[in-house]
UniProtKB/Swiss-Prot annotation:
Record function comment: RNaseP catalyzes the removal of the 5'-leader sequence from pre-tRNA to produce the mature 5'-terminus. It can also cleave other RNA substrates such as 4.5S RNA. The protein component plays an auxiliary but essential role in vivo by binding to the 5'-leader sequence and broadening the substrate specificity of the ribozyme.
Keywords annotated in UniProt: Endonuclease, Hydrolase, Nuclease, RNA-binding, tRNA processing
A single GO BP: tRNA 5'-leader removal
Self-association and partners: Consists of a catalytic RNA component (M1 or rnpB) and a protein subunit.
Protein name: Ribonuclease P protein component
NCBIfam families documented for this protein: rnpA
Reactions this protein catalyses: Endonucleolytic cleavage of RNA, removing 5'-extranucleotides from tRNA precursor
Gene Ontology MF terms: 3'-tRNA processing endoribonuclease activity; ribonuclease P activity; tRNA binding
One Pfam entry name: Ribonuclease_P
InterPro entries in UniProt: Ribosomal_Su5_D2-typ_SF, Ribsml_uS5_D2-typ_fold_subgr, RNase_P, RNase_P_CS
Family label: Belongs to the RnpA family.
Amino acid sequence: MLSACNRMRRSSEFDATVKFGLRAVQSDVIIHVWRGCNRDETKAPHVGLIIAKTVGSAVERHRVARRLRHVARTMLGELGGADQVVIRALPSSRNVSSAWLAQQLRNGLRCALDLAETDW
């Protein structure tokens, strides 16, 4: 579970991250990473999830969200204080194992962070 200080809540944060952030596409998830201008390490990074109804029923969507939150929590150490991450689950994410979803999320986040470092 993500702590309250790490959760993205405002739609403006989601919009900015998706619009201005770098995107890494995996087969079951899309990761948007926006490295903020204010590189304040005392702040906590924010993570948000987008799980559309196309993923499945409410039970399936919540299961996917729980899996993604669990993996995202373990990767907070790789993020800077001003970083914002949006994870969009694709419909195929409901059919894959937790380990496969975790691997895709780690690979996608690593790819997006590498892109952000070269652009920064």
